[in-house]
């Protein structure tokens, strides 16, 4: 069995029958111009490490880049993504005149849930206020 993951002009190929990969690459090369970058290490914000037990996925570089982007690289980490039983209030705080920063930040954190499902509840709470976020919501998101 072979798997192809295609994103725009990038293709990741893998499968449990490694001898089929060169044949597939040769067939694709006959139709398209290809550049083989070797074993997969990084793809769409995911770090991929191959071990004897399989593939290990991580987003540590993506998370570091996000912290750098929002100027929080030296922030103290929290033990949990949000306080248990906490709920955000729609009208708490003043509405943001440009909600783009909040929406972008929540989108970036949402992407982290691929490898950090423990963030899902907190992200779901933040997503409820995408249309009219307040300054309090932005602080909580950070």
Where are the model-predicted features located?
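Long, low-complexity, charge-biased intrinsically disordered regions
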Residues: 1-142
């Amino acid at each position: 069995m072979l798997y192809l993951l295609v994103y725009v002009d990038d293709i990741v190929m893998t499968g449990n029958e490694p001898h089929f990969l060169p044949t597939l690459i040769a067939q694709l090369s006959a139709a398209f111009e290809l550049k083989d970058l070797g074993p997969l290490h990084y793809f769409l914000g995911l770090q991929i490490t191959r071990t004897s037990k399989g593939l290990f996925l991580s987003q540590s570089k993506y998370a570091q880049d996000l912290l750098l982007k929002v100027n929080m690289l030296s922030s103290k980490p929290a033990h949990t993504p949000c306080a248990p039983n906490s709920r955000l209030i729609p009208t708490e705080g003043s509405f943001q005149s440009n909600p783009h920063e909040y929406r972008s930040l929540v989108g970036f954190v949402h992407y982290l849930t691929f490898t950090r499902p423990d963030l899902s509840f907190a992200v779901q709470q933040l997503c409820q206020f995408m249309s009219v976020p307040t300054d309090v919501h932005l602080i909580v998101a950070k």
